[in-house]
C-alpha cells in the first residue's frame, strides 16, 4: 500500500527476478499485492483527475516519467503538467462522480493512464497546488464550496 510510486516494478517478458520481486512485495505471502498490465501510454503521463463533490475538476495533472523511469509519480521524479481533461477523462470522471458522491466521498483523486482507470485514491488525492498554479483553475475554492454545501445539507 505504498504511495509516490513506491513498490512499482516493470516486469518484462523474460520475467527476470519475478519470484524475488513477488516475495519482496508480498512479504513471503503475508501481504496482498496488486498487479496490472503495463500501459505504454504512461509515456504521456499518469493523469490525476480530482473529483470534488461528485464533479470533476476540468484539468488533470499528467505526471510524466523522466528518463528511463516508468513511474510518473512526482515523488519518483515525474514531471507534473496540468492539462484539460480529454473526452475519455471526462467520460470516466462523470461516470464515477455520482457513485463516489453517493458513497459520501467528497474528495477523490482518480488516476488514468491513456484511457484506462488505474486507481481510485480516497486517502491521498493530491495535485491541488500544481493544477491551480499551472492551469489557473482554483481547485481549493471548488473544494471549499463543495465542503460548505456538504455541511449545509
Which residue ranges define each predicted feature?
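ATP-dependent carboxylate activation and anion-phosphoryl transfer catalytic cores
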Residues: 68, 84-153
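Short, solvent-exposed secondary-structure boundary motifs
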Residues: 1, 38-42, 98-102
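Phosphate-binding site of ATP-dependent enzymes
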Residues: 4-92
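Short glycine-rich anion-binding loops that position phosphate/pyrophosphate groups of nucleotides
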Residues: 1-3, 125
Amino acid at each position: 500500500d505504498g504511495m509516490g510510486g513506491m513498490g512499482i516494478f516493470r516486469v518484462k517478458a523474460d520475467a527476470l527476478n519475478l519470484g524475488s520481486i513477488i516475495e519482496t512485495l508480498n512479504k513471503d505471502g503475508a501481504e496482498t499485492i496488486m498487479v496490472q498490465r503495463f500501459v505504454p501510454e504512461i509515456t504521456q503521463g499518469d493523469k490525476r483527475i480530482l473529483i470534488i463533490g461528485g464533479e470533476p475538476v476540468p484539468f488533470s495533472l499528467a505526471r510524466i516519467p523522466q528518463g528511463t523511469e516508468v513511474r510518473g509519480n512526482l515523488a519518483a521524479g515525474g514531471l507534473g503538467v496540468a492539462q484539460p481533461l480529454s473526452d475519455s477523462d471526462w467520460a470516466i470522471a462523470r461516470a464515477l462522480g455520482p457513485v463516489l458522491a453517493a458513497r459520501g466521498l467528497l474528495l477523490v483523486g482518480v488516476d488514468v493512464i491513456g484511457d484506462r482507470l488505474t486507481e481510485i485514491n480516497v486517502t491521498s488525492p493530491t495535485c491541488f497546488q500544481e493544477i491551480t498554479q499551472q492551469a489557473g483553475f482554483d481547485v481549493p475554492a471548488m473544494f471549499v464550496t463543495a465542503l460548505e454545501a456538504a455541511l449545509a445539507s
